[in-house]
């Protein structure tokens, strides 16, 4: 049980770091992401995850930023994805910063609660996994989202896009934690 409490604290700390960055970017850009249609958001997630995988394989970054900031971006874009699923996309920035932060906090809390339930059932299995596995699982979730989008959301037995966003967020938080330890 002590490990699960440690995980909860680390998860909350990682989300707090992501939130602080999100809030600063919101100040700089407002909620410009409101314009993103679902497929563009999926492609943005893909770009971030693909870069992580590329850096893991090449062991070198010519841009200078490493893997950890990309996991943070995946967390924030995953939460943006949940907001967009909830609110729909817009043609203009139609949300003030306060509302954006309220929604951010709502979905971050949902991700935390989901992690707690899954971590209980899976008994801290994430701690024994490699960071590269998180990357591959995230890429798999993105491919699933693409297929669900191609099907117009009409799945037979699969979880929806929201569940895949939640899993992306959780795997990315685990990546941030592992790269912080």
Summary of predicted features, one role per range:
Residues 1-181:
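Intrinsically disordered, low-complexity regulatory regions
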């Amino acid at each position: 049980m002590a490990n699960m409490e440690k995980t909860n604290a680390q998860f909350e700390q990682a989300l707090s770091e992501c939130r602080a960055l999100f809030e600063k970017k919101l100040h700089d850009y407002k909620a410009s992401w409101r314009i993103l249609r679902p497929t563009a958001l999926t492609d943005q997630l893909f770009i971030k995850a693909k870069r992580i995988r590329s850096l893991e394989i090449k062991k070198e970054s010519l841009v200078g930023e490493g893997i950890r900031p990309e996991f943070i971006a995946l967390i924030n874009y995953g939460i943006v994805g949940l907001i967009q699923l909830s609110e729909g996309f817009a043609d203009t920035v139609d949300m003030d910063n306060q509302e954006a932060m309220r929604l951010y906090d709502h979905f971050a809390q949902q991700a935390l609660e989901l992690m707690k339930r899954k971590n209980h059932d899976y008994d801290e299995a994430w701690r024994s996994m490699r960071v590269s596995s998180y990357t591959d699982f995230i890429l798999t979730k993105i491919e699933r989202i693409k297929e669900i989008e191609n099907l117009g959301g009409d799945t037979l037995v699969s979880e929806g896009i929201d569940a895949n966003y939640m899993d992306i967020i959780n795997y990315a938080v685990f990546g941030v934690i592992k790269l912080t330890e």
